[in-house]
């Protein structure tokens, strides 16, 4: 109560922060008349002036007012749009590195230009992050008009670009792209072998659009670049045949935790099936040698019990394609890891693709925390403000709307069964359609959207075929005639190619659009329809300019008329009075876009996003959720008690219960789920931070190695450290000579370093100590390496040293990632022994990391001590492109092997001597200096011709 009173008297902290920006808004407004007088060239020249002022010592904060005023003026001249005062405030929040929460239709894309331009003046590159390629292209194409007018360059990163195109896009002042592409480019860059092949140029400032979707909804799924392992499709198919043979008593499913475990009876049955199939090693399922079999049994169980076709994935063209649970979009190319995707393929009797090995991975949480400054925009972040601050140190600032929100949010209607709920939704759609009010129905899955579509078809509605040209002509004609068209559109993962078009036209009179969750997010729904979309669709084939202009005028008139129809599509409802009270009264519910939610999502934020599609820029609108006790949220979180209560109240079939208490109870259930999901994400981050710290060490070290002209000092240090470890192991400090393992040391030197040294004779010398032994071994090893440098030349050896070091580091890092994954899967069991799994994981991960570094020293030293360089037997005409080897960023590898150099042990073939050289036969060339003319006769230096990869 005291807090509420204080907020009423002094305003909330958010109100005070917003008011704090007003003085700068006034200063920007004061500059407007002055800038309006400038010519285009004078306005453009201000960019150069700002850059000079930065060079002279001014800060970006010092330039905020004049820079924002300049962007506003440029926007007026290029786009015909002027930033509102509240949009200026949004730009300031972004510049300060926080999250601007702005309602749908408030112009977030335009707001971003303010902070983007200001920060781009620093010359370090600004990244604007969107959720899909369409939005990246659209926003870059649209906003580059402002940036280009002011002399800044704009690039776009989308799927399918090669490295040269990516590098050019990142070199621009401003780069638009998707969160996936930025993350994968970072991972691929850290798999390259030369600095000039890297495409990104740092992480200075990023603005994340739909920040809640990217930093929260996708935080649990890491970006993974992987490569295929051996084909085990027969094994997966065999395991899959076992699951249908199990009864429900053989396993226990926990839907809340998304886990499934075998019971004692189930284990015995599986053991018998495995034994009969010849897949069981030893006596018991839980013998050590059967660990991977147990893992795959569990994955097959999960595939059959926890994953539903058309909800969690779809089957398309012989492939199992994941569906994003938050957006309902297909995610082609992305695959579940650790055998789960293969289990789904076996379940659906599709070709089982090879399992993948993780080559590199990072979570969005850790990728975006690398930026010096991070900001975000969204329409719904307030409910997750604590998490955004806790993990990313981002404060959420609610920006006031330019016009008050005029949407009516009605109480939920709760029915007993899903069938009753769908019948009520259908009746509501028919009432709205009869008065030409456009309806957007939100569903939680493809399966639910298609159930609704089937209901509509049964009642005489036809689905719009967006594969045909002018798909909406019948809808437009019916709207002009003032009649319902009885047509509907479905927007889900199956039809995401037409996503923007379907969403943009969801505001046409009589339109019925069924959309999974938040599909189409980022595209505004304008009442009456989208002018840009219709012009694009309806003038595509018109070449005559006069005819085109006339068509555009007709479309404009159409949309203006349609908008009026939608605004007038109000509903007058008669409310029956209670017994003994006054006569019935009527209530008018607004027109505009009508949002119908077919069930509540686990997160309040997703529900708010759906509501937020209506009521943009002060337009009227309404929203209502229809629920049933059979919905997932209701079923998992206590529908049994509610069902018995409704029975006692005498609720009849087809009747709904509507009360604010129900809304509050649901909100509490959602808060519990949100809190649980936050804890899961937070816990995952704690574990991922362990790997992230190690990743940073390895990636930073790789970049340093690539920057160095020569890694000879590093190689020498590694060799000496390995020899030191070897001597310490076999000749411990302060041990007596009789305790030395001289024979073991001699064998190890021969095995690893290929050095046959008289260690046994040295050990018998009077007064010899471990330090003297160490020094002699190091000297002999150094002499062996010096001889190789003398034989092959310093240029060749420097290249070989760097390549072997980087390749070995990459190989061991990948093996280390597998070890960490396995450790993470089993570490939770330590909790049963009263030990903290996180602390245990940290300790063991560090031990594994130290072991990897020791192994690196040994492996690199061993390879270099034995390496011989053999020129190729014949010239390679073509070479594989040095880029990631995967169709989609989720399953790719960026690995470079020797093209024209073979590394063989010294026991193999000897080097080819330099004889009389035949220009057409590279095998006769012998050793060629990198700066010599190429023996092929091209006239180029060897290093620029056949020696490029030697």
UniProtKB/Swiss-Prot annotation:
Record field: catalytic activity: ATP + H2O + cellular proteinSide 1 = ADP + phosphate + cellular proteinSide 2
Source domain of life: Bacteria
Key words, A-Z: ATP-binding, Cell inner membrane, Cell membrane, Cytoplasm, Membrane, Metal-binding, Nucleotide-binding, Protein transport, Translocase, Translocation, Transport, Zinc
A Gene Ontology term for the protein's cellular component: plasma membrane
Membrane topology of this protein: Peripheral membrane protein
Residues annotated for ATP binding in this entry: 87, 105-109, 524
Cofactors required: Zn(2+)
Region ranges (Disordered): 873-892, 908-932
Family membership noted in the UniProt record: Belongs to the SecA family.
NCBIfam families: PRK12904.1, secA
Functional note: Part of the Sec protein translocase complex. Interacts with the SecYEG preprotein conducting channel. Has a central role in coupling the hydrolysis of ATP to the transfer of proteins into and across the cell membrane, serving both as a receptor for the preprotein-SecB complex and as an ATP-driven molecular motor driving the stepwise translocation of polypeptide chains across the membrane.
Protein name: Protein translocase subunit SecA
Lineage of producing organism: Bacteria, Pseudomonadati, Pseudomonadota, Alphaproteobacteria, Hyphomicrobiales
């Amino acid at each position: 109560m005291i807090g509420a009173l204080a907020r009423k008297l002094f305003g909330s902290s958010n109100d005070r922060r917003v008011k704090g920006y007003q003085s700068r808004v006034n200063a920007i407004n004061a500059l407007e008349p002055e800038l309006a007088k400038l010519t285009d060239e004078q306005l453009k020249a201000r960019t150069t002036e700002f850059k000079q002022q930065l060079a002279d010592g001014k800060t970006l904060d010092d330039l905020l007012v004049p820079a924002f005023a300049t962007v506003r003026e440029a926007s007026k001249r290029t786009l015909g749009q002027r930033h509102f005062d509240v949009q200026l405030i949004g730009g300031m929040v972004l510049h300060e590195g926080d999250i601007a929460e702005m309602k749908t239709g408030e112009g977030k894309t335009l707001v971003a230009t303010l902070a983007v331009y200001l920060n781009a003046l620093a010359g370090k590159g600004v990244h604007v992050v969107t959720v899909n390629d369409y939005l990246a292209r659209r926003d870059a194409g649209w906003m580059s008009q402002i940036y280009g007018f002011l002399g800044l360059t704009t690039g776009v990163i989308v799927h399918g670009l090669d490295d040269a195109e990516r590098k050019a896009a990142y070199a621009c002042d401003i780069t638009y792209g998707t969160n996936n592409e930025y993350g994968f480019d970072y991972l691929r860059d850290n798999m390259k072998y030369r600095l000039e092949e890297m495409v990104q140029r740092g992480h200075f400032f990023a603005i994340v659009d739909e920040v809640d979707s990217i930093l929260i909804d996708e935080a649990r799924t890491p970006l993974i670049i992987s490569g295929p392992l051996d084909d085990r499709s027969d094994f997966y198919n065999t395991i899959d045949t076992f699951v249908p043979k199990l009864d429900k008593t053989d396993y226990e499913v926990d839907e809340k935790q998304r886990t499934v475990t075998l019971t004692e009876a189930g284990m015995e049955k599986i053991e018998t099936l495995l034994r009969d199939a010849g897949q069981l090693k030893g006596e018991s399922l839980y013998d050590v040698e059967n660990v991977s079999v147990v893992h795959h049994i569990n994955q097959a169980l999960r595939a059959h019990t926890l994953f539903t076709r058309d909800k969690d994935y779809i089957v398309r063209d012989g492939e199992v394609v994941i569906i994003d649970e938050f957006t309902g979009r297909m995610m082609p190319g992305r695959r579940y890891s650790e055998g789960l995707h293969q289990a789904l393929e076996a379940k659906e009797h599709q070709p089982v693709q090879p399992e993948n090995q993780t080559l590199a991975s990072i979570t969005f949480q850790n990728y975006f925390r690398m930026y010096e400054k991070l900001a975000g925009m969204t329409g719904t972040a307030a409910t997750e403000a604590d998490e955004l601050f806790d993990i990313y140190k981002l404060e959420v600032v609610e920006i006031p709307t330019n016009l008050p929100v005029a949407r009516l949010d009605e109480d939920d209607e709760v029915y007993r069964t899903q069938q009753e709920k769908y019948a009520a939704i259908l009746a509501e759609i028919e009432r709205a359609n009869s008065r030409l009010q456009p309806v957007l129905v939100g569903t939680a899955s493809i399966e639910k959207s298609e159930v609704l579509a089937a209901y509509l078809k049964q009642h005489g509605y036809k689905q719009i075929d967006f594969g045909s040209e002018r798909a909406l002509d019948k809808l437009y004609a019916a709207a002009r005639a003032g009649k319902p068209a009885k047509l509907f559109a479905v927007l889900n993962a199956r039809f995401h190619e037409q996503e923007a078009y379907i969403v943009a036209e969801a505001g046409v009179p009589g339109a019925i659009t069924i959309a999974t969750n938040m599909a189409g997010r980022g595209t505004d729904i304008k009442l009456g329809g989208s002018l840009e979309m219709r012009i694009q669709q309806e003038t595509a084939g018109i070449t005559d300019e006069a005819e085109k202009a006339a068509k555009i005028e007709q479309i404009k008139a159409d949309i203006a008329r349609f908008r009026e129809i939608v605004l007038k599509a109000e509903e007058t409802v008669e409310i029956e009075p209670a017994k003994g009270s006054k006569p019935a009264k009527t209530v008018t519910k607004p027109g505009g876009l009508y949002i119908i939610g077919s069930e509540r999502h686990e997160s309040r934020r997703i529900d708010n996003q759906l509501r937020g599609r209506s009521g943009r820029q002060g337009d009227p609108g309404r929203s209502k959720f229809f629920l049933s006790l059979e919905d997932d949220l209701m079923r998992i979180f206590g529908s049994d008690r509610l069902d018995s209560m409704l029975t006692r109240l005498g609720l009849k079939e087809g009747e709904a219960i509507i009360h604010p208490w129900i809304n509050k109870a649901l909100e509490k259930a959602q808060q519990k789920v949100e809190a649980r999901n936050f804890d899961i994400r937070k816990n995952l981050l704690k574990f991922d931070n362990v790997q992230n710290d190690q990743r940073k060490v390895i990636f930073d070290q790789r970049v340093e190695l690539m920057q160095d002209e020569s890694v000879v000092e590093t190689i020498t240090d590694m060799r000496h450290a390995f020899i030191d470890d070897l001597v310490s192991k076999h000749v411990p400090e302060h041990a007596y000579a009789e305790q030395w393992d001289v024979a073991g040391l001699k064998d190890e030197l021969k095995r690893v370093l290929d050095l046959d040294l008289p260690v046994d004779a040295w050990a018998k010398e009077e007064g010899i100590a471990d330090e003297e032994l160490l020094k002699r071994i190091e000297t002999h090893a150094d002499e062996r390496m010096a001889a190789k440098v003398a034989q092959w030349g310093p240029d060749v050896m420097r290249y070989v040293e760097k390549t072997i070091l980087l390749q070995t580091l990459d190989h061991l890092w990948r093996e280390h990632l597998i070890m960490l994954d396995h450790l993470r899967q089993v570490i939770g069991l330590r909790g049963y022994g009263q030990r903290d799994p996180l602390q245990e994981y940290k300790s063991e991960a560090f031990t594994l990391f130290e072991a990897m570094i020791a192994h690196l020293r040994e492996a690199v030293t061993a390879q270099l001590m034995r390496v011989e360089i053999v020129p190729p037997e014949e010239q390679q005409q073509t070479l594989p492109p040095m880029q990631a080897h995967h169709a989609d960023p989720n399953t790719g590898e960026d690995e470079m092997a020797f093209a024209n150099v073979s590394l063989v042990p010294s026991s193999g073939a000897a080097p080819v001597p330099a004889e009389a050289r035949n220009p057409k036969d590279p095998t006769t060339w012998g050793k060629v200096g990198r700066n010599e003319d190429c023996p092929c006769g091209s006239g180029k230096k060897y290093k620029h011709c056949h020696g490029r990869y030697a």
